[in-house]
C-alpha cells in the first residue's frame, strides 16, 4: 500500500540517494571522477533542499512509502490559487508501476474539489512529460530548460465523477 509521511532529518541520506538517481543520465556526459560527481551532487542537493524549504508558503514535504519501504518523495505547495507540485520522484525500480500516476490523480482530484489549477515545472527531457500531458497538463510557459505546466480544474459531473484521464 502506498502512503505518505512527512520527511524527517533521518530521511536525508535516502533523499540524497533518490536525488542522485534522478541525475544518473548526466554523469556520463561530464566525465568527472566519482568523487567529483558526488561532491557536485551533494552541493546541488543541499541547494535544492534549502530552496524548497524557503520558497513555498504552505508546503508539504513527504516521503512516498510502499509498505515500510521509502520509494520516493512528493513535495506539494497548497495555496488558495493553486496546488503546485514542487517535486515528485521515485527510485528507478519503482518507476513506471503506476505509483506516481496514482499520486498525481489524487492531487488532480484535490484541485478539482477546490476548483483551482494544479501546476508544476518539468525539465524538457524528463520522461514524465508524457504522463503529465496524458493527465491533462498543458504547457503554459517556457522556462529555458523546463516547461511550466498547468492543469485547470475540471468540474465534477452530476454523477459525482470527475474527468481525470487515465495515463
Predicted regions and their residues:
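Conserved acetyl-CoA-binding loop-helix of GNAT-fold acetyltransferases
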Residues: 96-109, 130-134
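Conserved GNAT acetyl-CoA-binding A-motif
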Residues: 111-123
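Acetyl-CoA-dependent GNAT
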Residues: 9-12, 16-86, 91-92, 104-110, ...
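Active-site acidic-Proline motif in GNAT/NAT acetyltransferases
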Residues: 91-97, 124
